[in-house]
């Protein structure tokens, strides 16, 4: 953000573009709020539920929300999973040199701490229309705790689907397609060639995701459809025509 003036701008723009009228957006694995807080600012008629399991990141997230007077944001120190309870989550100090964007249940750390686990069904609201999940391979467990929300088929879902966690990606695709959602590939660069500050040295670096659209919601971003759970994400910007508006060819 400091170097390029943006982070995951494409992902944020997509979510904002879907946020017509009013509603609730749930951000699971919100980190320090790089998506949740700009969304809350750009969509003041929406409520944002930001969930973060790491104590330090949660503290920064809450402070950022208050400092920026984003009163339409609720911040929860919790993990999201298949059932309500208590779990052990890595307790890495913010002073450590670590990629906190990759921190999750599978991370190897010397210490853990007990945090509460919630389900999306208990925390989400009736007007939930957008859900973003980025939990480093734990996505299927989060969806197991969202059976009611999934069954209502009202929300648009943006879920991380990386090559580092192919089994989790396959399960996520299978869950959505089994419930009648249309599933698409979505690639979001960390920074784009049209960034406000310095252009990125590696404009292709970014996060792989899937988008699940409920019945009746149009594919307005011309996303590439996922054929099935075993498919690998296509490479190259031509598979993601929406990237052209950000300087990709």
Predicted regions and their residues:
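Hydrophobic packing residues within well-ordered alpha-helices of enzyme cores
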Residues: 39, 61, 89, 142-146, ...
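Proline-aspartate-enriched helix->loop->beta-strand connector
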Residues: 155-158
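Conserved S-adenosyl-L-methionine
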Residues: 76-78, 181-190
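S-adenosyl-L-methionine
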Residues: 1-64, 68-71, 107-109, 185-194, ...
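Short internal loop-to-helix segment that lines adenine-nucleotide cofactor pockets
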Residues: 3-26, 86-91, 102-153, 164-167
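Short, hinge-like loop/turn segments at secondary-structure boundaries
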Residues: 66-68, 90-96, 150, 169, ...
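Short strand-turn motif at the edge of the Rossmann-like AdoMet-binding core
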Residues: 53-54, 136, 160-163
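Core alpha/beta nucleotide-donor-binding catalytic domains of modification enzymes
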Residues: 58, 62-94
């Amino acid at each position: 953000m400091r170097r390029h003036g943006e982070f995951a701008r494409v992902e944020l723009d997509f979510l904002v573009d879907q946020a017509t009228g009013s509603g609730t957006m749930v951000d699971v694995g919100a980190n320090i709020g790089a998506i949740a807080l700009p969304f809350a600012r750009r969509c003041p008629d929406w409520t944002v539920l930001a969930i973060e399991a790491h104590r330090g990141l949660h503290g920064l997230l809450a402070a950022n929300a208050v400092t920026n007077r984003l009163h339409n944001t609720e911040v929860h120190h919790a993990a999201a999973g298949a059932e309500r309870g208590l779990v052990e989550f890595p307790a890495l100090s913010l002073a450590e040199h670590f990629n906190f964007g990759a921190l999750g249940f599978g991370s190897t750390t010397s210490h853990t701490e007990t945090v509460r686990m919630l389900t999306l069904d208990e925390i989400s609201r009736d007007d939930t229309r957008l859900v973003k999940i980025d939990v480093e391979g734990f996505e299927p467990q989060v969806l197991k705790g969202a059976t009611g929300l999934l069954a209502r088929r009202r929300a648009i879902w943006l879920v991380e689907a990386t090559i580092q966690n192919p089994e989790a990606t396959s399960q996520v695709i299978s869950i959505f397609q089994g419930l009648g959602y249309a599933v698409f590939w979505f690639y979001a660069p960390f920074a784009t060639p049209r960034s406000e500050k310095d252009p990125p040295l590696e404009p292709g670096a970014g996060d792989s995701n899937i988008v699940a659209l409920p019945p009746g919601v149009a594919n307005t971003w011309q996303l590439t459809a996922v054929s099935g759970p075993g498919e690998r994400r296509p490479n190259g910007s031509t598979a993601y025509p929406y990237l052209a508006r950000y300087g990709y060819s």
